[in-house]
From Swiss-Prot:
Organism taxonomic ancestry: Eukaryota, Metazoa, Chordata, Craniata, Vertebrata
Gene Ontology BP, a term: RNA polymerase II preinitiation complex assembly
Subcellular location: Nucleus
Keyword Magnesium: no
GO MF annotation: an example: DNA binding
Protein name as annotated: Transcription initiation factor TFIID subunit 12
Positions bearing the Glycyl lysine isopeptide (Lys-Gly) (interchain with G-Cter in SUMO2) cross-link: K19
Amino acid sequence: MNQFGPSALINLSNFSSIKPEPASTPPQGSMANSTAVVKIPGTPGTGGRLSPENNQVLTKKKLQDLVREVDPNEQLDEDVEEMLLQIADDFIESVVTAACQLARHRKSSTLEVKDVQLHLERQWNMWIPGFGSEEIRPYKKACTTEAHKQRMALIRKTTKK
């Protein structure tokens, strides 16, 4: 369970350009049908990244703990830590922006988990643990076989004549 509760909703009605700055809400009930509302107070702090006091998603301490889980003897350089934190923040911002566009597309003023889930599944081939995809059916691009390409070329050739 994350700090935003099982299912985060963000009110999109007052924002033309969405800059994510999550505010925590207490977890609620079961993960299946509950929702939590997350307000977006403003834009990120200096340098484009959220500051630790603004509930930054990935902090240096969390990153160091993650590295220690992988290899207890490994130590990251300061520049590498900053770059990884920036990449994580950019990823979160791009996912939230795309999810907000999906919410607006379905004419909703709230960002729901299914918006984030759809973007992550389709664009990044990622799934959110703990959330079933009853509403979102798997989307797979049909791979075109060589025989299909030859048939299509023959059809195009005959229609040009």
